[in-house]
From Swiss-Prot:
Name the UniProt record assigns to this protein: Protein pelota homolog
Compartments (UniProt record): Cytoplasm
Keyword terms of this UniProt record: Cytoplasm, Endonuclease, Hydrolase, Metal-binding, Nuclease
Family that this chain belongs to: Belongs to the eukaryotic release factor 1 family. Pelota subfamily.
EC number(s) from the headed UniProt entry: 3.1.-.-
Disulfide bonds: none
Quaternary structure and interacting proteins, as annotated: Monomer.
Length: 357
């Protein structure tokens, strides 16, 4: 994300969305009641006289829309903001009519808020910082099968699976030839994805020796690619293996600032403390509020969905209270496994400095 201009007096920030991750951040920055300004296309009815049929044309126009609905369409790569028009650059566009602004990669948009809250500012800074960071690719590989995923700012995106039938015995000549074809297929797919997505690092993981064989193959055949590869063990393959890599902290070690890795590990710490029954965790609104009142919250985990729901004001007050007592607030994406686990706990959890019971 690129910040183009800030106008604190008017409560306006003009930004350019550069990636899919930026769209995810904007979805959480824009609230109901905000005014969103952008260049857009609008259908306009034209009639030259009463005898002629009404003609509809699409016109380019700069609009300001007061947000009533904000939707993130991951597969269309869009954030859609719908609401009444409050500003139009053309006089023939009536104010008060409803319009949807589609924010895509490359869209320049101005957001105006009555008040920019701390979590909005934090997310904006994070989006700008994230745009300078490389994302991480995970490849879980075993006999004739490889699953690839991209760790994005909003969660884990499963990209593709590659399957080759390698046949029987491990040292059979035909098998070795097919394995080489499989390795070439995986390597070329990795290169294509890493170039397209501008990924600087790939974690190659798996339960057996195949990952080491693949690494050796890369060293001999893809010397530039192998420089970007880190090897890791997993106990399983497939999607479960991908999440195991994240839980082990490998993504964090490879790129220590990665948001998803941090969120998943914090949720695992919460679950670990619950299992230990050590009193150093609270979850659910009542328990977390009580811990915050004592100043006991070291890290507050908030599911992003709560900041779009009816409890938003109450949650924001809780976040402010935790920050006041020098606790850390982490907004957890609902788009990954850790977010699903937090949702099962009511969407709120806290790691505590000391026991309150």
């Amino acid at each position: 994300m690129q910040i183009i201009h800030e106008d604190p007096k008017e409560g306006k920030v003009k930004v350019k969305a550069e990636t899919l991750d930026d769209l995810w951040h904007l979805y959480h920055i824009i609230d109901e009641g905000d005014v969103v300004y952008a260049k857009t296309l609008r259908k306009q009815s034209q009639r030259s006289d009463s005898l002629r049929a009404e003609k509809v044309e699409v016109i380019p126009v700069f609009l300001g829309v007061r947000a009533e609905k904000i939707n993130f369409h991951k597969f269309a790569n869009q954030v859609r903001v719908t609401g009444p028009i409050v500003y139009a650059s053309r006089e023939d566009v009536p104010l008060g009519k409803y319009h949807t602004i589609a924010i895509e990669e490359g869209t320049v948009v101005t957001i105006q808020k009555p008040r920019w809250k701390e979590h909005h500012i934090e997310r904006l800074r994070e989006a700008v910082s994230a745009s300078k960071r490389a994302r991480v690719m995970i490849v879980v590989i075993d006999d004739g099968e490889a699953d690839m995923a991209l760790v994005r700012e909003y969660g884990v995106e499963i990209l593709t699976s590659i399957r080759h039938n390698l046949g029987g015995k491990r040292y059979n000549t035909d098998r070795e030839a097919e394995e080489k074809r499989f390795f070439h297929d995986v390597a070329k797919t990795m290169e294509e994805i890493m170039n397209r997505e501008k990924v600087e690092k790939a974690i190659v993981a798996g339960p057996g020796f195949v990952k080491e064989d693949f690494y050796k193959f890369l060293r001999e055949n893809y010397p530039e690619l192998v420089k970007k590869v880190v090897i890791e063990d997993t106990s399983v393959t497939g999607r479960t293996g991908i999440y195991e890599v994240i839980k082990r902290g490998t993504v964090d070690r490879v790129y220590h600032e990665n948001r998803v890795a941090k969120e998943v590990q914090l949720i695992e710490k919460v679950l670990e403390n619950i299992a230990k029954n050590n009193g150093l965790v609270a979850y659910g609104l009542r328990e977390v509020e009580e811990a915050a009142n004592y100043g006991a919250v070291e890290t507050l985990l908030v599911l992003d969905e709560l900041l779009k729901g009816e409890m938003r004001e109450k949650i924001e007050e809780l976040m402010d209270a935790v920050r006041y007592s020098r606790g850390e607030v982490v907004i957890v994406s609902s788009e990954h496994e850790g977010g699903e686990k937090l949702k099962a706990l009511g969407g709120l959890a806290a790691l505590l400095r000391f026991r309150v019971k």
